[in-house]
Amino acid sequence: MNQPQTKTQQNLQAAFAGEAMANRRYLYFGQLARKLGNEEVAQLFERTADEETGHAFAHLQLMYPESEMTVEKLLQIAYEGEMYETEQMYPTFAEEARQEGESAAVAEFIEQGAESREHAERFKAMLQRAAKQFKAFGRVEAAHAKRYAEALEKVTAR
């Protein structure tokens, strides 16, 4: 999905990333606040995280309009994202962390890269399975259409 992007599309991606990160950060902060004994602050973070999710979804709806999406497109976009993480992002991050002597970060990036590959493989397998199913459905629909056409021809020939 390497298409040229407008500045607005880039801004939507950045806004989505910010809202999604805020959601995860606030959920984490809520857990920490609860462990530290402050339930009121934990709930504040959790409510705010829910609102951030709404903001992120609003951006996603503009980035990936429902009217333009198919199951195949969704799976392909997800696959490409996971492959980017596997082949480019995490290896680069791991190397940079290695150069800076951040061994815990190196291990984290390597582990996440491996998990991203697993995710990519799952999306690819489902994409292949869906393609086979749609191909089979196409044959079934063609057979039905042929029978309908034959039946219509018999009825109109009378």
List where the protein language model places each region:
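Non-heme di-metal
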Residues: 1-158
